[in-house]
C-alpha cells in the first residue's frame, strides 16, 4: 500500500470563528496556529498549505496570565542600526490589540513563504463584529482547564 499524498484539489477549507474573550493569549495562539496549518486534519502534509480560515473576534479582551501584561515586552526592529523598539503588552493591547494577537500567532507559524500564505488566512478583529458573515464561519470553542 502506498502512502497517500494529498493534492491541492483535495483540500477543503472551512471558516472558523474564535471568540478570544477571557482566553489566555498563548492557548488562543496555539489553537489558531494549528487551524491555520491544517494539523487538525487527517490529510495534513507539512509541505502544503492545508489550513482553514480563522476569524478571531474580541481580541481586545484577550487574557494574559500572571504579570505578563505589565512585564512582557513586544519587540520589533526597523532594520537600521539601533532600530530595536519595544513596547509593553498592556500598551500594545490598549493601542492595537489585533497586532498583539497576530504577533503571538505569527511566532507559531513557519517562517517561510508557506507560513506567509498561511497567515493570509488569519483575520483578527478587536470587537465582536466582522465582515465575513457570508462565509458562514463555524464557531470554534477553546476549552481551558484553568486561567
Swiss-Prot record:
InterPro entries associated with the record: Ribosomal_uL13, Ribosomal_uL13_bac-type, Ribosomal_uL13_CS, Ribosomal_uL13_sf
Keyword Ribosomal protein carried by entry: yes
SUPFAM superfamilies in UniProt: Ribosomal protein L13
Matching CDD domains: Ribosomal_L13
GO molecular function annotations of the record: mRNA binding; structural constituent of ribosome
GO cellular component term of the entry, any: cytosolic large ribosomal subunit
Keywords: Ribonucleoprotein, Ribosomal protein
GO biological process: negative regulation of translation; translation
Keyword Ribosomal protein carried by entry: yes
Pfam families registered for this protein in UniProt: Ribosomal_L13
Function: This protein is one of the early assembly proteins of the 50S ribosomal subunit, although it is not seen to bind rRNA by itself. It is important during the early stages of 50S assembly.
Oligomer status and interactors: Part of the 50S ribosomal subunit.
Family: Belongs to the universal ribosomal protein uL13 family.
Protein name stated in the entry: Large ribosomal subunit protein uL13
Species of the source: Streptomyces griseus subsp. griseus (strain JCM 4626 / CBS 651.72 / NBRC 13350 / KCC S-0626 / ISP 5235)
Underlying gene: rplM
